[in-house]
């Protein structure tokens, strides 16, 4: 595996920096106030925010996309699959309701559209990352995962594999079957410890 994986804790959300030979991809952000936390986490690894080339949000809940626009304004490219477009502004009302002045809504026109079927070619060309984006609904209808050829998968808030049967959710089961079919054996969650399958 030539990708380096770095977990970064932003509040209660674990974000991941996946570094390829030619570029890097941040998976998820924390809440709107977490830009400083992200910067501090990177600094602990002798890095800064300029290391981040692309951002992929596993699903549009407030604790996964809160600083997306801040990062875009710092030069990071937000990758946005069409399956997520209807959900981009879903968390906005929560920030407005809570009078959160740190939050700024995403501007869709600032995002780079990236369809899952094109993701392998894009990630290879722009980051040197061998992997692909796949739709994995279950936790939310807009959930996506990044699956690396190494067998690592970044699944956001998809429930752990060993709990799938507790939910009795066919969509969640189907998403896990898709991940297993792609050879996933090490799962990185946003709120759970890693799970080896």
Q: Model-found features: residue ranges?
A:
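Short acidic-hydrophobic surface loop/beta-edge motif
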Residues: 8, 18, 119-128
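Conserved beta-strand hairpin/beta-sheet module of binuclear metal-dependent hydrolase folds
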Residues: 1-45, 145-158
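Residue-level marker for buried hydrophobic side chains located in beta-strands
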Residues: 25-27, 56, 78, 152-154, ...
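Metallo-beta-lactamase
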Residues: 32-33, 126-197
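Active-site HxH/HxHxD metal-binding segment of metal-dependent hydrolases
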Residues: 33-35, 43-121
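A general structural detector for well-ordered alpha-helical segments in enzyme core domains, enriched
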Residues: 38-41, 67, 172-178
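Short gly/ser/thr-rich secondary-structure transition/capping motifs
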Residues: 8-9, 39, 110-118, 135-137, ...
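A structural micro-motif
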Residues: 3, 50, 76, 129-131, ...
